[in-house]
Protein backbone atom coordinates (compact mmCIF):
# COMPACT_ATOMS: atom_id res chain seq x y z
CA UNK A 1 0.00 0.00 0.00
CA UNK A 2 1.55 3.26 -1.16
CA UNK A 3 1.14 6.69 0.49
CA UNK A 4 -0.64 7.81 -2.69
CA UNK A 5 -3.55 5.50 -1.77
CA UNK A 6 -4.37 7.55 1.33
CA UNK A 7 -3.62 10.89 -0.32
CA UNK A 8 -6.11 9.99 -3.06
CA UNK A 9 -8.72 8.99 -0.47
CA UNK A 10 -8.46 12.37 1.26
CA UNK A 11 -8.32 14.31 -2.01
CA UNK A 12 -11.56 12.68 -3.19
CA UNK A 13 -13.09 12.78 0.32
CA UNK A 14 -13.55 8.99 0.30
CA UNK A 15 -13.16 8.95 4.07
CA UNK A 16 -15.84 6.59 5.28
CA UNK A 17 -13.45 5.66 8.08
CA UNK A 18 -13.87 9.17 9.53
CA UNK A 19 -16.61 9.52 12.14
CA UNK A 20 -18.45 12.80 12.69
CA UNK A 21 -18.63 12.12 16.41
CA UNK A 22 -16.44 10.71 19.14
CA UNK A 23 -16.19 6.93 18.97
CA UNK A 24 -18.65 5.42 21.45
CA UNK A 25 -16.26 2.61 22.38
CA UNK A 26 -13.59 5.15 23.29
CA UNK A 27 -16.04 6.87 25.63
CA UNK A 28 -17.10 3.54 27.15
CA UNK A 29 -13.71 1.94 27.67
CA UNK A 30 -11.06 4.65 27.90
CA UNK A 31 -11.84 5.45 31.57
CA UNK A 32 -10.85 1.87 32.47
CA UNK A 33 -7.23 2.71 31.64
CA UNK A 34 -7.18 5.19 34.54
CA UNK A 35 -4.53 7.44 33.03
CA UNK A 36 -3.82 10.51 35.12
CA UNK A 37 -4.55 13.99 33.79
CA UNK A 38 -1.46 15.36 32.10
CA UNK A 39 -0.42 11.96 30.72
CA UNK A 40 0.77 11.86 27.13
CA UNK A 41 -1.22 9.69 24.70
CA UNK A 42 -0.17 8.60 21.20
CA UNK A 43 -2.72 8.20 18.38
CA UNK A 44 -1.23 6.69 15.18
CA UNK A 45 -2.87 7.37 11.81
CA UNK A 46 -5.13 9.87 13.55
CA UNK A 47 -6.65 11.58 10.50
CA UNK A 48 -8.89 14.39 11.70
CA UNK A 49 -10.74 12.30 14.27
CA UNK A 50 -12.75 14.01 16.99
CA UNK A 51 -11.36 11.37 19.32
CA UNK A 52 -8.33 13.64 19.69
CA UNK A 53 -10.58 16.32 21.18
CA UNK A 54 -12.18 13.83 23.56
CA UNK A 55 -8.80 12.70 24.83
CA UNK A 56 -7.68 16.30 25.30
CA UNK A 57 -10.89 17.02 27.20
CA UNK A 58 -9.90 14.27 29.65
CA UNK A 59 -6.90 16.42 30.55
CA UNK A 60 -4.46 14.41 28.44
CA UNK A 61 -1.64 15.62 26.20
CA UNK A 62 -2.36 14.09 22.79
CA UNK A 63 0.28 13.30 20.16
CA UNK A 64 -0.97 12.12 16.77
CA UNK A 65 0.75 11.04 13.58
CA UNK A 66 -0.95 11.39 10.20
CA UNK A 67 0.42 10.99 6.68
CA UNK A 68 -1.95 13.36 4.88
CA UNK A 69 -1.41 17.10 5.26
CA UNK A 70 -5.00 17.98 4.34
CA UNK A 71 -6.36 15.75 7.11
CA UNK A 72 -4.17 17.48 9.68
CA UNK A 73 -5.11 20.96 8.52
CA UNK A 74 -8.81 20.03 8.49
CA UNK A 75 -8.61 18.85 12.10
CA UNK A 76 -7.50 22.26 13.28
CA UNK A 77 -9.77 24.26 10.98
CA UNK A 78 -12.88 22.12 11.59
CA UNK A 79 -12.44 22.51 15.34
CA UNK A 80 -11.50 26.20 15.10
CA UNK A 81 -8.23 25.65 16.93
CA UNK A 82 -5.25 27.98 16.69
CA UNK A 83 -2.23 26.12 15.41
CA UNK A 84 1.53 26.55 15.27
CA UNK A 85 3.51 24.69 12.63
CA UNK A 86 7.19 23.87 12.64
CA UNK A 87 9.48 21.37 10.96
CA UNK A 88 10.63 18.42 13.05
CA UNK A 89 13.10 16.31 11.10
CA UNK A 90 11.23 14.62 8.25
CA UNK A 91 7.86 15.63 9.71
CA UNK A 92 5.85 18.81 10.11
CA UNK A 93 4.54 19.29 13.64
CA UNK A 94 1.18 21.04 14.04
CA UNK A 95 0.58 22.07 17.63
CA UNK A 96 -2.18 23.64 19.70
CA UNK A 97 -2.92 23.43 23.40
CA UNK A 98 -2.88 19.74 24.43
CA UNK A 99 -2.77 18.38 20.85
CA UNK A 100 0.27 17.92 18.60
CA UNK A 101 0.13 16.12 15.25
CA UNK A 102 3.21 15.00 13.36
CA UNK A 103 2.41 15.04 9.67
CA UNK A 104 4.42 12.49 7.75
CA UNK A 105 5.28 8.80 7.49
CA UNK A 106 4.61 6.88 10.71
CA UNK A 107 7.40 4.45 9.88
CA UNK A 108 9.85 7.37 9.82
CA UNK A 109 8.69 8.94 13.09
CA UNK A 110 11.55 9.09 15.63
CA UNK A 111 11.12 7.91 19.21
CA UNK A 112 12.02 11.22 20.82
CA UNK A 113 8.56 12.89 20.62
CA UNK A 114 7.05 9.86 22.36
CA UNK A 115 9.59 9.33 25.14
CA UNK A 116 7.13 10.49 27.82
CA UNK A 117 4.06 8.73 26.41
CA UNK A 118 2.16 6.50 28.83
CA UNK A 119 -0.99 5.81 26.79
CA UNK A 120 -2.07 5.09 23.22
CA UNK A 121 -5.21 4.65 21.16
CA UNK A 122 -5.65 2.75 17.87
CA UNK A 123 -9.11 2.76 16.32
CA UNK A 124 -8.34 2.89 12.62
CA UNK A 125 -4.61 2.20 12.28
CA UNK A 126 -4.14 -1.57 12.60
CA UNK A 127 -7.19 -2.29 10.44
CA UNK A 128 -5.98 0.18 7.79
CA UNK A 129 -2.99 -1.97 6.85
CA UNK A 130 -3.22 -4.87 4.39
CA UNK A 131 -2.06 -8.20 5.83
CA UNK A 132 1.40 -7.95 4.27
CA UNK A 133 2.09 -4.66 6.11
CA UNK A 134 0.33 -5.36 9.39
CA UNK A 135 3.26 -6.98 11.17
CA UNK A 136 5.53 -4.11 10.15
CA UNK A 137 3.06 -1.69 11.74
CA UNK A 138 2.88 -3.68 14.98
CA UNK A 139 6.68 -3.70 15.24
CA UNK A 140 6.80 0.03 14.50
CA UNK A 141 4.18 0.83 17.14
CA UNK A 142 5.90 -1.35 19.72
CA UNK A 143 9.21 0.33 18.94
CA UNK A 144 7.77 3.80 19.47
CA UNK A 145 5.98 3.11 22.76
CA UNK A 146 7.81 3.12 26.10
CA UNK A 147 7.46 0.01 28.30
CA UNK A 148 4.27 -0.15 30.40
CA UNK A 149 2.38 2.17 28.04
CA UNK A 150 -1.31 1.26 28.22
CA UNK A 151 -3.82 1.66 25.44
CA UNK A 152 -7.00 0.73 23.64
CA UNK A 153 -7.10 -1.12 20.32
CA UNK A 154 -10.36 -1.32 18.35
CA UNK A 155 -10.58 -3.86 15.52
CA UNK A 156 -13.02 -5.25 12.98
CA UNK A 157 -13.28 -8.88 11.89
CA UNK A 158 -15.26 -10.39 9.02
CA UNK A 159 -14.66 -12.89 6.19
CA UNK A 160 -11.95 -11.03 4.26
CA UNK A 161 -12.87 -12.70 0.99
CA UNK A 162 -16.31 -11.06 1.16
CA UNK A 163 -15.00 -7.50 0.89
CA UNK A 164 -11.86 -5.68 -0.13
CA UNK A 165 -10.36 -3.54 2.62
CA UNK A 166 -9.61 -1.16 4.07
CA UNK A 167 -10.77 -1.58 6.72
CA UNK A 168 -9.18 -5.01 6.75
CA UNK A 169 -10.33 -7.92 8.88
CA UNK A 170 -8.14 -8.63 11.90
CA UNK A 171 -8.99 -11.73 13.91
CA UNK A 172 -8.48 -12.30 17.60
CA UNK A 173 -6.17 -15.19 16.71
CA UNK A 174 -3.98 -12.85 14.65
CA UNK A 175 -3.76 -10.35 17.49
CA UNK A 176 -2.87 -12.98 20.05
CA UNK A 177 -0.20 -14.53 17.83
CA UNK A 178 1.43 -11.42 16.41
CA UNK A 179 1.01 -8.82 19.15
CA UNK A 180 1.55 -10.87 22.32
CA UNK A 181 5.37 -10.76 22.00
CA UNK A 182 5.13 -6.98 22.49
CA UNK A 183 1.95 -6.44 24.51
CA UNK A 184 -0.08 -7.89 27.31
CA UNK A 185 -3.52 -8.35 25.75
CA UNK A 186 -7.00 -8.38 27.26
CA UNK A 187 -10.16 -8.43 25.15
CA UNK A 188 -12.70 -6.14 26.82
CA UNK A 189 -15.58 -6.51 24.36
CA UNK A 190 -16.67 -8.13 21.10
CA UNK A 191 -19.94 -7.04 19.50
CA UNK A 192 -21.91 -7.92 16.38
CA UNK A 193 -22.04 -4.65 14.42
CA UNK A 194 -23.18 -5.81 10.98
CA UNK A 195 -26.56 -4.06 11.15
CA UNK A 196 -24.83 -0.75 11.92
CA UNK A 197 -22.63 -0.88 8.81
CA UNK A 198 -24.69 -0.65 5.60
CA UNK A 199 -21.64 -0.95 3.34
CA UNK A 200 -21.03 -4.44 4.67
CA UNK A 201 -24.73 -5.35 4.48
CA UNK A 202 -24.92 -4.14 0.87
CA UNK A 203 -21.93 -6.30 -0.05
CA UNK A 204 -23.65 -9.26 1.64
CA UNK A 205 -20.89 -9.76 4.19
CA UNK A 206 -22.33 -12.54 6.40
CA UNK A 207 -20.99 -11.26 9.73
CA UNK A 208 -19.02 -8.38 11.20
CA UNK A 209 -17.68 -7.99 14.72
CA UNK A 210 -15.96 -5.10 16.47
CA UNK A 211 -13.63 -5.78 19.37
CA UNK A 212 -11.96 -3.64 22.01
CA UNK A 213 -8.63 -4.66 23.52
CA UNK A 214 -6.66 -3.36 26.44
CA UNK A 215 -2.96 -3.50 25.60
CA UNK A 216 0.06 -2.93 27.81
CA UNK A 217 3.51 -2.60 26.24
CA UNK A 218 5.83 -5.22 27.71
Curated annotation (Swiss-Prot):
The reaction(s) this protein catalyses: S-adenosyl-L-methionine + a thiopurine = S-adenosyl-L-homocysteine + a thiopurine S-methylether
Stated EC number for the protein is 2.1.1.67
Q: Where in the cell is it found?
A: Cytoplasm
SUPFAM superfamilies associated with the record: S-adenosyl-L-methionine-dependent methyltransferases
Cysteine-cysteine disulfides: none
Which key words are in the record?
A: Cytoplasm, Methyltransferase, S-adenosyl-L-methionine, Transferase
Principal localisation:
cytoplasm
For the protein in the UniProt heading, the enzyme class is transferase
> Which residues are listed for S-adenosyl-L-methionine binding in this entry?
10, 45, 66, 123
> Which molecular function term from Gene Ontology is one that the record holds?
thiopurine S-methyltransferase activity
A single Gene Ontology CC annotation of this entry is: cytoplasm
Q: Which Gene Ontology biological process is one annotated for this entry? A: response to metal ion
**Matches recorded under NCBIfam families:** PRK13255.1, TMPT_Se_Te
Family in the record: Belongs to the class I-like SAM-binding methyltransferase superfamily. TPMT family.
HAMAP family named in the record: Thiopur_methtran
> How is this protein named in the record?
Thiopurine S-methyltransferase
* Record organism: Shewanella loihica (strain ATCC BAA-1088 / PV-4)
Q: Taxonomic lineage of this organism?
A: Bacteria, Pseudomonadati, Pseudomonadota, Gammaproteobacteria, Alteromonadales
